[in-house]
Structure formats: C-alpha cells, structure tokens
C-alpha cells in the first residue's frame, strides 16, 4: 500500500446536491468579498491569490466567509456589499471569486449570516434585531423580531442566495452557529419568547427552517445548502446534545450538509470556536458523530484537525463525511495535495498558537492598538501571497548553514527550492533545535511535529544535513561555500540570583524531560510565555505549582487568545505571586520580596527557572567565516531570542536574498 492509499476515505469523492466534492477536505469559511475602494467592483488581487492556495491545494470546496445579508446583519460597519443591484458591474466581484475557485478545481460557496443581537450600533443603520428586546453587551438596544421581520429576513436571505447563484456559486452556507441570529433563536439562554418562535425545540428551530425552505424553493435542488452549527455552546445554560441533534433533524428537511463547529464568537477560545493547544484535536468530532447518527444527510466537522491521519480516521469510523480546515490551511494550504502525492510527512501542522486569530475583532483591535500579528508562525508566506513565488536563483551557489533549528531548516528548504546546493551543520545529534523539548509535552506534540516536517522537507529537497558536526576552519575550506548562514539559536538566561545554580534548580526546557528529577512541590520563576506554559504542564503532570513573576501581567508575550486560555488555566490550578522579586534560591525553596517590600520563603522541592533566553554568541564563527572572505548572514534567535515566527520568516527571507 502506498502512502496515498492509506487515506482512501479522505481522498474519496462524494456527491452532494448534484455536485462532486473531489475529496473530503473543505476550506472553512475564510475572509469575505470586499475591496477597500468602493468605486472598484473587481476582486481584491490578494484575496484571489489566497483562493489559489486554499482552493488550489486540493481542497474540495472553498467557502467565502461571513457575508451579512443586510447592512443590519453585519457585526460592524462596511461589512455589507449589497445584494439589491443585480447588474453585471455589481456582481463582477462575486463572479471573479466564483470563477477563480472553479479554476482551481473546487466548489464555490458563500457563508451567509445575520448577527442579530450581536450587532454593534452603527449611525444611520437600521435598529438591530434579535429574538428578544434587550440591551446587548455593547450597550446597543435590540428590538425583538416581529412576524413582519421574519418575512423580511426570509426575503433578504433569498435575495442574497440568488445573487450568489447568478454569480456562479454552487451553494451557500447558512451560518446557524457562533452566537449569531439563528443560534440566538435556538438557545434557551437567549430565546425566552412565548410565540411560535420560542419555547419548544421545534419553535426555536422554526426561523432557521423557514429561511432554509425559502432558499430551497428559490434556488432549486442542485444549489448546495449547507448549515453551520455550534455543536455545543460550552457555556452554562446552553442547549443540550439532544437539542442540537433535534435541531439538525429539522434543518435536514431542506439542507444538504451539516457543518459542525462549536462555541460563541464573543469567547472563541473559552467556548471552542477556536480551539487552543489545550483542547483535543478534532474537539467537535464526538458531537458531529451524534449529529450524523441523527440525520440522513452528510456531516462535516471543523475544530483543531491538523493531521491527515486523524481526518482519515474520523471519516473511516463514520463520525463525519467531510473535514473542514481553517487555520491548518493557513499553516499549509497544500494539505490535501501533499496527502494525494504521498507526502503527508511534509505537512506543516497548525500549532494552534493563535497568532493568526486574535479573537473578536473589536476587542482585539482595541487591546492590540490595531497592531494585529501578521502571518502564521510556521508558514512564512501566510498573509504575503507574493512570497509564494520562489524564483530560481540567477547564480547557483553553495550555501553553508550552521544550526539545525527551524530557522536553519527553513533556510535550507528555501535555498534548495531556488536551486542552490545546501550543506547544513548541526552540532547535536538531532535537528529541530529548541523545539525538541516539546516531544515530551502532550500539548505540544505539534511543535515537535513541525521540526520533523521541516527535516522531512529538507531531506526530500536534497539538502546535505550533517549531524554531530561543528564548523571548523578545515571544514569551511573543504565545503568552500559561497554564502554562510548562521542560525545557532539561543540559550536560557540565568541572572545572578544566589542559589540559582543549586542542585534543586532545573531549567524550564529540561523540566519536560522524562528523566527530570522534580519534587512534588515546584516553584516556577518567571511568568512569561515559557514560564506559564511550563507551570501548566507541571500541574498536568501532578505537581503542586506556584509561580513567581516580577511584573503584574502573566504571559505578555503570548498571542492574545492563547494568553487568555493560559491565564484561565493558571488562575484555576497554579498559585501566583505577582509583582514579586526572587531574592535567592535555597534548599528550602525560594525567597521572594513582595510588592509591599515584605520578604517570604515559598517552600519548594524543585525550582524551575524560566527567566528568558539570550542569543548565542556568533563572534568566533563570524570571524572564522570573514577570514575566509565568505559573506556571512545571521538569522533567528542568534540575532535576538524571539518567536518561531521570526525564526521561520528570517530563514525563508535569507534564502530568497541569496
């Protein structure tokens, strides 16, 4: 059996509403159809380039993301393109999207939504509507929907769907989850109506069913109607598994496909709308399986799926018919193509680090002062479509890379893509650098997997990878490189704290090792990202953990939603000492000075130091290379200790510059 045959279920086509899905992998709702120039009716070139990746990478269908059916149906301003004008000029952008998706071999759908009571108040727009009259969390007054509003809503969705159909789309996805309007009617938390739209499950499902029926009658049998639901709300008072299964049975009267997600937009990490690395992969699969058993139409599932092995297993076991990928396609848009070509080991599997998704736009914009992190930690081309064009080098060179962490490996892969000869020297017996600790943390297996994927790519492309090898003058003369790239990483910072070199002190990265000799009671010094993650790991391993941090904020260097989840776990399971300074480490524990100047001893069997990282000194190597008259470049943590994103990006860009 070859590698592709191992994924026979994942790669099998499926017929839905008269259309053939070429595989069982679907690109989750992504982006939207917009152009910042209101006078321009052409599609944004960067969005079209993203389609080439997400649809062209072998996925069966591409869903254009949340598209409000009216101006009042969008969360904020400028989200509504307008479906009243059916002119060629006005539909051109949609036609270009549909055509580009089809050109890449995928089916084209648009996700239609109405946010209901989650609406932000926009001057000049209609009064927001919802199941109940209330004032929402943003202070916006919400008007309870009337029968006339329901009729208008059906008409609005029909108009939008027909617009998409005329533009060449194969179907629409009705967004019935994540706390938007149809979800608000379904949930007993948000719907206490006493008319035919409230009370029983049938009544709470009625609005969704009415809209679906109207869409089916208007668009015909061969127009795909997909419904995206939150399989669970993951909040107190939310609907039950029995409720969501019953709801999906009602939807299946007119829908062709149920798409199972989870949670609420307002709290995406806490409710599993966007699972963090602390939730299981395929976190919605069991709910999807229950729904699949309750309906007689195909079921798709999204939620932390980043491996073809799990995707194949879910389909083979009958838990779902299709898998939906979002962040994974940001990490590697060629997921399906690599599986089909028998290269699954080269897939860059999403870390769920939350770099690419900071959370609810309005909150994140305010908290981050509009400075959203760009791109993906492990894909240097994400958010940079122009970077995918790797041109062959005009002059083929021999490139020597010193250091086999992810910066060096990425440089090796990209240099080989450009046609250079690559020799990589790694002084240890293993590639992956600082990420190798993660193989011992069940929550971080994807980090270790990324290092292995990078190694597999480098080997597949023909890089000469030499382990247990250091750079010497003799070796430099033997290799005769035209360019040298130094990627020798960083090391743990150890400030001059008395006792920090004691036998009861362990460095954070070493604390993950199976042979680490840790006592039951552990104090972690340092509440940055590394310290917080280590504290959570040790708690999960059964230790009693306390954490000491000089600042008043935990994990300020973590990405926003990952930071939120970390803080939740620490608040529940780790005792913290904030604004506290470590004075000394003794055999009995840690002596700290609190923010009020008081001094106390925190008892500890073991002290774990997570006090930052410092760039390794490249001076001797630079001098060696310079004496040979060879151009020398530095990338990654040996420039300055930072994040995986920086290492991968610099590795990629350095190879492009050669």
Q: In which residue ranges do the predicted regions lie?
A:
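Flavin-dependent oxidoreductase catalytic cores
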Residues: 1-402, 406, 410-417, 422, ...
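Short beta->alpha linker loops
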Residues: 305-306, 471, 580, 639
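Rossmann-like dinucleotide/flavin-binding elements
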Residues: 393-425, 431, 466-480, 488-504, ...
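Short beta-alpha connecting loops at secondary-structure transitions
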Residues: 271-277, 321, 435-443, 550-555, ...
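A short helix-to-beta-strand connector/capping loop
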Residues: 319, 458-465, 501-504, 570-575, ...
């Amino acid at each position: 059996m070859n590698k592709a045959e191992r994924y026979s279920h994942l790669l099998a086509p499926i017929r839905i509403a008269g259309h053939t899905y070429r595989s069982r992998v679907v690109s989750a709702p992504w982006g939207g159809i917009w152009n910042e120039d209101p006078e321009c009716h052409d599609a944004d070139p960067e969005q079209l380039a993203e389609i080439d990746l997400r649809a062209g990478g072998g996925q069966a269908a591409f869903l254009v993301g949340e598209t409000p059916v009216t101006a009042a149906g969008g969360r904020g301003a400028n989200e509504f393109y307008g479906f009243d004008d059916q002119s060629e000029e006005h539909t051109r952008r949609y036609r270009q999207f549909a055509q580009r998706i089809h050109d890449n071999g995928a089916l084209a759908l648009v996700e239609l939504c109405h946010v209901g009571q989650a609406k932000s108040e926009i001057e000049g727009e209609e009064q927001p509507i919802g199941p109940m009259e209330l004032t929402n969390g943003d202070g916006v007054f919400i008007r309870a929907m009337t029968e006339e509003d329901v009729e208008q809503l059906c008409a609005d969705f029909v108009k939008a769907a027909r617009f998409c159909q005329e533009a060449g789309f194969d179907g629409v996805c009705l967004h019935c989850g994540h706390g938007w309007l149809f979800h608000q009617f379904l949930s007993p938390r948000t719907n206490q109506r006493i008319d035919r739209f409230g009370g029983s499950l049938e009544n709470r499902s009625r609005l969704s069913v009415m809209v679906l029926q109207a869409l089916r009658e208007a668009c015909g049998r061969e127009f795909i109607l997909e419904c995206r639901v939150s399989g669970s709300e993951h909040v107190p008072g939310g609907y039950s598994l029995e409720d969501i299964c019953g709801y999906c049975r009602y939807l299946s009267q007119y829908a062709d496909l149920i798409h199972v997600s989870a949670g609420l937009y307002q709290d995406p990490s806490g409710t599993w709308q966007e699972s963090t690395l602390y939730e299981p992969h395929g976190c919605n699969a069991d709910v999807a399986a229950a729904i699949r058993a309750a309906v007689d139409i195909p079921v798709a599932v999204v939620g932390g799926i980043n491996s073809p092995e799990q995707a194949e297993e879910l389909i083979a076991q009958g838990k779902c018919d299709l898998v939906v990928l979002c962040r994974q396609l940001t990490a590697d848009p060629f997921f399906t193509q690599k599986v089909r070509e028998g290269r699954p080991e080269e897939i860059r599997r999403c870390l769920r680090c939350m770099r690419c998704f900071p959370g609810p736009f309005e909150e994140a914009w305010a908290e981050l002062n509009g400075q959203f992190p760009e791109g993906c930690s492990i894909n240097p081309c994400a958010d940079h479509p122009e970077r995918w064009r790797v041109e062959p080098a005009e002059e083929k060179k021999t490139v020597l890379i010193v250091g086999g962490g992810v910066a060096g490996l990425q440089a090796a892969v990209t240099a080989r893509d450009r046609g250079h000869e690559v020799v990589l020297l790694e002084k240890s017996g293993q590639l992956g650098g600082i990420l190798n600790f993660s193989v011992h943390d069940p929550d971080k297996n994807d980090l270790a997997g990324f290092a292995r994927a990078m190694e597999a790519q480098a080997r597949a492309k023909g890089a000469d990878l030499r382990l247990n090898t250091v750079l010497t003058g003799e070796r430099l003369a033997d290799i005769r490189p035209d360019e040298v790239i130094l990627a020798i990483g960083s090391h743990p910072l150890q400030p001059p704290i008395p006792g920090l070199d004691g036998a009861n002190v362990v460095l954070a990265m070493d604390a993950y090792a199976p042979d680490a000799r840790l006592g039951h009671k552990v104090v972690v010094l340092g509440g940055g990202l590394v310290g917080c993650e280590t504290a959570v790991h040790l708690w999960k391993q059964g230790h009693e953990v306390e954490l000491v941090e000089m600042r008043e904020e935990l994990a300020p260097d973590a990405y926003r939603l990952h930071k939120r989840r970390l803080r939740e776990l620490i608040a529940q399971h780790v005792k913290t000492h904030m604004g506290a300074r470590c004075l000394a480490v003794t055999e009995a524990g840690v002596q700290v000075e609190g923010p009020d100047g008081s001094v106390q001893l925190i008892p500890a069997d073991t002290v774990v130091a997570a006090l930052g990282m410092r760039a390794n000194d490249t001076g001797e190597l630079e001098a060696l290379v310079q004496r040979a008259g060879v151009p020398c470049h530095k990338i990654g943590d040996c420039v300055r200790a930072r994040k995986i994103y920086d290492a991968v990006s610099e590795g990629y860009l350095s190879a492009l510059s050669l």
